[in-house]
Structures are given as C-alpha cells and as structure tokens.
C-alpha cells in the first residue's frame, strides 16, 4: 500500500479481518464487548484514518464522520451491542454478514466484473452473488459460534444457516440499490433485525393456520395479478414494477388477507395520483418521475418490502405481538406514501422552500 494513496483492496481486507473480533463475543461479557466497541469508535474517529497517510479513507469521507464508512462500521457494532445486550449471537451474525458479505462483494465486483445489475449500473451480478454466499456463511458461522457458547439449548447450525441466508439475501438486495444510506449502517442493522426476528418464528402457527394461508395465497395471487396488470395498463408501473408489486402484494395478502391488501392498494393509488398530478409541468422543469411516472421494482421494494416483512411476522408470531406488528405495517406504508406525496406535490407549490 502506497503512503497516502487510497487502496480499496486494503480497505476491504481490513473490513473483512475486523469481523474476526465477533468470535470473542462467545467469551466476553456484554459490558466488555461494548467497551471495546466504544474504543474502536474513538480510534476510527482519530488515529485509524491517518494510517498509511490516509490510505484507508476515500476522499469524500474526510469531510465528516457521518460519511466515513470506517467510523460507521464500528459505530454500528456498538449500537447493535446496545440494542441486543442479551442476544450477542444476533450481533455476531450481523457482523459476519457485514464483514464477509459486504467485504467480499466489493472485491468480487472489482476483480471479477461481469454484467451489471439491471437496476444499478454500479453493481454487478458477481458482486451481489458473492455478497449472498459469503454473507450467508460468515453470518451463520459467527452467529452459531456465539450462540453455542451463550445459549442452552443452542440453535442448530442448519437453522442458523437458513436465517443467515435470508438476512444475507435481503442485505445483498439493499446493497445493490445504491441507496444514499451508507452500507455500514444499512447492512448490519437490517441483518440484525432479521436474525433476531427470524429466531422468534413459531412453525406451529403456520401448521395451525395452513389451510387459511393457502386460501389467502390463492386469493392474493388472483387479486394481485388483476391489480398489477391494471396498474401496468394505466402506465402506473413498469414491467419490473409489476414483478416487484406482485412479490410484496402476494406476501402481504397471504399473511394479512384482503384487509392488508386494501391498505397497500390505498397508499399505492394515493402515490400514483400524486405522481400524475401536474406531471406535464414537472416534466418541463425536469423534476418529474421518469418513464412517464411508471414506478419500477426498485420503488416497490423500497416502499413496501418493510411492510411485506411485517405482515409475514404478524402471521408467524404469537397473537400478543400481532397488534403492534400490524400497526407498524400501516405506519411503514403511510411513511412511504407521505414521502411520495411530499416529493410529488411539494414541487408544485409556489414560493421559496424552507
């Protein structure tokens, strides 16, 4: 590594190697792990960025700690320790997905290259595939290692591998969307949330309601097909939007029935109407939604994937948790709809912005 010259390879090597500290969570008490993480937060804000003349840091990261992936990495781990003090296996699993999935994905994307993802010109199929594979193995290994030393009975490696695979897949998709949120925040928090919630699932609930789930799935399939193709005919969505909408819509209807679908449909119609409102004027000013206002799969997943997962949890967890989950389901869709309304109607207002 040349002094003062940024090296992506060195940065990601450090990113991956730091994941090894997650193995210590099997032996460390919570307070000791939190103190070490706090020390890392301080170090990554002070002397670590100066190593090799700043070769670990991208140029854009020198302006603010909130833009520094190096600092956000350690900050995320500290926050996970604060949120999950009794579930260090969750922290370890999420850490494994972050260290191995995100780390090896960048190296593979640059080293292997290959075709780009249809929805992101900056990401490759190779990178996302490696993210999923490496993240799955890293998360499962770290999560199981810590759980086997801190829980009794410990979950099987097979169960942890399945949970880690779901978390890594979700994180790989989020990472591929090139969101403004730094990957060192989005990946560990999403992975930890999935590790924790998926461990709480009760298969007995699915067995008891299997007939109802099959019925709601078939109803959801029919209703969502009609709704999606109607939206396509009205040019409210693109073909990728049809696919993304079917995925989240069928999931929501299967676990929440037609009432949950009605909430989804209401907010979709509301957002689509706001997009069409004053579209010609917005197009002349260059601020209109592209493709004539048709939303794609990225929009469907960004706006509705949280709601779909909450619906899945509401249908898979004990009844005492369901009211809160359905409230969160409505809130997540309302938040996405309000964001759309603000961005579509706001530009139509006259006067100076705040």
Where are these regions (language model features)?
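Hydrophobic alpha-helical transmembrane segments
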Residues: 1-119, 124, 128-354
């Amino acid at each position: 590594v040349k002094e003062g010259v940024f090296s992506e390879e060195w940065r990601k090597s450090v990113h991956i190697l730091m994941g090894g500290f997650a193995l210590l969570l099997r032996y460390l008490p919570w307070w000791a792990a939190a103190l070490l993480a706090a020390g890392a937060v301080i170090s990554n804000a002070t002397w670590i960025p100066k190593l090799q003349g700043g070769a670990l840091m991208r140029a854009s990261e020198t302006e603010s700690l909130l833009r520094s992936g190096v600092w956000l990495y350690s900050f995320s781990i500290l926050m996970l320790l604060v949120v999950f003090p009794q579930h260090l296996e969750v922290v370890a699993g999420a850490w494994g997905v972050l260290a191995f999935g995100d780390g090896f994905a960048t190296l593979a994307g640059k080293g292997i290259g290959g075709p780009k993802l249809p929805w992101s010109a900056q990401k490759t199929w190779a990178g996302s595939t490696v993210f999923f594979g490496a993240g799955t193995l890293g998360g499962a290994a770290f999560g199981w290692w810590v759980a086997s030393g801190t829980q009794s009975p410990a979950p099987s490696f097979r169960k942890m591998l399945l949970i880690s695979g779901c978390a890594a897949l979700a994180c790989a998709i989020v990472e591929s969307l090139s969101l403004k949120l730094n990957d060192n925040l989005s990946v560990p928090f999403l992975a930890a949330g999935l590790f924790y919630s998926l461990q709480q699932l009760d298969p007995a609930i699915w067995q008891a309601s299997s007939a109802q789930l099959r019925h709601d799935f078939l109803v959801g399939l029919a209703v969502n097909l009609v709704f999606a193709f109607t939206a396509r005919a009205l040019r409210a969505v693109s073909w990728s939007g049809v696919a993304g909408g079917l995925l989240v819509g069928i999931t929501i209807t299967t676990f929440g029935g037609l009432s949950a679908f009605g909430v989804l449909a209401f907010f979709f119609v509301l957002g689509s109407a706001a997009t069409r409102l004053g579209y010609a004027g917005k197009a002349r000013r260059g601020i209109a939604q592209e493709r004539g206002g048709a939303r794609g799969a990225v929009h469907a997943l960004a706006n509705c994937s949280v709601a779909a997962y909450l619906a899945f949890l509401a249908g898979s967890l004990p009844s005492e948790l369901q009211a809160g989950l359905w409230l969160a389901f409505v809130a997540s869709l309302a938040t996405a709809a309000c964001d759309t309304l603000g961005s579509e109607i706001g530009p139509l207002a006259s006067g100076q912005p705040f």
